[in-house]
A protein has these predicted regions:
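Non-ligating segments of multi-cofactor redox enzymes
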Residues: 1-218
Length: 218
């Protein structure tokens, strides 16, 4: 399905719907530009207390830190806001982007000597098709489509695309679903790292789990 400019599709993660089937992981591996590697990560939230899983894709930051710290100018952002994997001729394998990403998304693929990450299946979305992961997700944890459809199908939650890290708020192209009665304008990731309340918001818990190792070693 293709969309016009006025009804551009949105990419939404609803982590509370993830059932851990890994269909998204397998589909990502089959994407033609991914060289047989999955660029989506299935995170396990607080393994000691729950079996809950959550998919983690590139959030496609409005001002991508990964691109800003790249000394070789290897990471490009499209006019539609998609942050792409590093360009092979330019990437020098320094891993600056890996260390700089607030969401822990970029990965150095040593066998290719190249940073690779989710590019929202740009070969598909640029021609009006859904990303592979959203196409196969059976529970709707990964959704790609009209913004108004998100509101119609998920009446108890709403999307947010702003995440606070200390004094910095990061705005992203990809959104996460939060409870509709939560009136906060952003998800405070730093607070989740320090508080980590039992049974707390899944979106915060998964980000806390992803970032905790980096914080503990700093």
């Amino acid at each position: 399905m293709s969309y016009g400019i006025d009804d551009a599709p949105v990419f939404v993660i609803d982590q509370s719907r993830c059932i851990g089937c890994e269909a998204c992981v397998q589909a990502c591996m089959e994407c033609g530009t991914h060289r047989g590697r999955s660029l989506i990560h299935l995170e396990r939230i607080d393994r000691a207390t729950t079996t809950q899983t959550a998919p983690m894709v590139c959030m496609h930051c409005e001002d991508p830190t990964c691109a800003q710290v790249c000394p070789a100018d290897a990471i490009k952002q499209t006019e539609t806001g998609i942050v792409q994997s590093a360009l092979k001729p330019r990437c020098i394998g320094c891993s600056n982007c890996v260390l700089a990403c607030p969401f822990g998304v970029p990965k150095m693929m040593t066998e290719f000597d190249l940073m690779m990450k989710c590019d929202m299946c740009y070969d598909r979305t640029s021609t009006g098709r859904k990303p592979m992961c959203a196409t196969v997700c059976p529970s709707g944890a990964l959704y790609y489509g009209p913004r108004e459809e998100v509101a119609a199908l998920r009446k108890r939650s709403r999307p947010t695309n702003q995440f606070r890290f200390g004094n910095q708020v990061v705005t992203t192209k990809v959104s996460m679903m939060v409870p509709r009665d939560d009136f906060a304008t952003h998800l405070d990731v730093t607070a989740a790292l320090h508080e980590r309340p039992a049974g707390g918001l899944i979106a915060l818990n998964v980000l806390a789990d992803i970032l905790a190792p980096a914080e503990e070693t700093s």
